[in-house]
Amino acid sequence: MSHVKHSGRRRGFTLIEALVVVAILSTLLALVVPSAVEWIRVQRVKASADELVTDLQFARSEATRRNLEVAVTFRTVAAQTCYTIHTRNAFGSCKCELGNGNACSFGIADNRFELKTVSLPTSNAVSLTSSLSSSIYSPASAFVVGMNALQVAIDGGDDRKLRVQTNATGRPSICAPTGSTIKGYTTCP
């Protein structure tokens, strides 16, 4: 019979050591998770503002490129806030709540008016509130028709707020309203 000789040193972790590691990791997670959730919420607001600025610039350029008036129409319905970029038409305003590809169909098989529709479901915890129901860009100058400045409040709950605004020429920019906790933007006038 052979005997295996054990050295005096054991390998592995004891139950106490494993519990200490679990306790330390739990404490670290409790500190990190709330800040990670907050970071995600702030990123949603920033991404919504950035996308809206890009879409307003797109609407301006499409008005010039197509030599047609291009509108950005905002709507709020129970389950979402949304907007549609579309060419002006004789059928009326587009309804972004009908979804991408259907917002400007007006019962016509050829949906040639809709350029883009963006929806923000309320479950996303970000909402848009526009000072105008529509902002229309002129093909001749890419300025806003009527020189009406647009302000869109982007609200992510609590103090996570940004504002996208256009000047009289239609150029969009992002600012942080007073009291916003989102850093890196100028304060809105």
Task: Describe the function of each predicted region.
Residues 11-23:
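N-terminal signal-anchor/signal peptide hydrophobic helix marking the start
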Residues 2-9, 27-53, 57, 61, ...:
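N-terminal helix-rich module
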